[in-house]
Amino acid sequence: MASNKVSFIFILFLCVLSTAEFGEAQNPRGRKCEDPNGVDQKAKCYIYCNEQGFLGGSCQGYTNHYMCECYVG
């Protein structure tokens, strides 16, 4: 019975990790950006994310709400 509980908790833990986009760094306090296509022509997101300790970033979002999204790799 105890092994069933351990298995259930382990599976639940894996489900939480998979929905949290494990391996992709998220920066909830991002910077607003102007390039709606993720191009980041002025490299504002790239520079901002490097200053935050990430390897890079791009401009993501929807109409009138584009933010820099930083990532690890």
Swiss-Prot record:
Its main location: secreted. Disulfide bonds join 33-59, 45-68, 49-70. Transmembrane segments: none annotated. It is found in: Secreted. Keywords: Antimicrobial, Disulfide bond, Fungicide, Plant defense, Secreted, Signal. Residues 1-25 form the signal peptide. GO terms for biological process: defense response to fungus; killing of cells of another organism. The keyword Signal applies. One of its GO terms (cellular component) is extracellular region. Belongs to the DEFL family. This is Putative defensin-like protein 33. It comes from Arabidopsis thaliana (Mouse-ear cress).
